[in-house]
């Protein structure tokens, strides 16, 4: 049997669109791609939204999403959708990790640290709100939130909208037995960057 090599080439950021304005791929000199599309069989597939396991078709794809989906052969929930499903069916609260968190925080303070936005790439604020609500249901008395502002997967000036949403939610839960507040904050560019300068990282961690 004759066999031929197959090469899987991943080109992040390359997409198919007839739009001219802002279309770097269409404007570029791409002789190899042009040849392949003119002489070989090909098809366009979606790399965003529900086709790759994200919550909705409004959610853009990115390198992490694409790399997780390549070669699966079927749609798997990933990222924010996976977390959202586990919250909706309650399985996250049955996990050993959650049970241990709640047990350790009884009589103490439970801290939440994470990205505060609904960008759905790395987080969704609805998950945090749900966990704060569940923490109260399970008898915890004190919650402190350390917010990392986004500005990348959502508009750069949208941070206060998420702060208000969080504060309104906590205010609706706070009473004589429950106290939830924002304790500190920071920016994702300082605390979530892959290879930050040591001075930047140390200063940001101390702040939070």
Indicate where each model-derived feature is located:
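Conserved anion/nucleotide-ligand pocket segment
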Residues: 197-200, 205
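Active-site nucleophile/metal-coordination loop of metallo-enzymes that catalyze phosphate/sulfate
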Residues: 2-6, 14-190, 203
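Conserved small/polar residues in nucleotide/adenosyl-binding loops
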Residues: 208
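Secreted, luminal/periplasmic, and some membrane-associated catalytic domains
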Residues: 192-195
């Amino acid at each position: 049997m004759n066999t031929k090599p197959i090469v899987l080439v991943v080109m992040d950021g390359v997409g198919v669109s007839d739009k001219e304005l802002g279309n770097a791929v269409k404007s570029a000199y791409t002789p190899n791609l042009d040849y392949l599309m003119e002489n070989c069989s090909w098809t366009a597939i979606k790399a965003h939204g529900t086709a790759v396991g994200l919550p909705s078709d409004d959610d853009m794809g990115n390198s992490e999403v694409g790399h997780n989906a390549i070669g699966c052969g079927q749609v798997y929930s990933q990222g924010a959708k996976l977390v959202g499903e586990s919250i909706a069916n309650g399985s996250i609260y049955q996990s050993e990790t959650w049970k241990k968190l709640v047990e350790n925080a009884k009589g103490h303070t439970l801290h939440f640290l994470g990205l505060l936005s609904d960008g759905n790439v790395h987080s969704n604020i609805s998950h945090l709100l749900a966990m704060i609500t569940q923490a109260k249901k399970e008898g915890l008395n004190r919650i402190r939130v350390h917010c990392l502002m986004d500005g990348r997967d959502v508009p750069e000036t949208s941070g206060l909208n998420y702060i208000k949403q969080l504060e309104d939610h906590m205010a609706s839960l706070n009473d004589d037995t429950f106290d939830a507040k924002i304790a500190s904050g920071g920016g994702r560019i300082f605390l979530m960057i892959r290879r930050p300068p040591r001075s930047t990282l140390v200063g940001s961690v101390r702040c939070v």
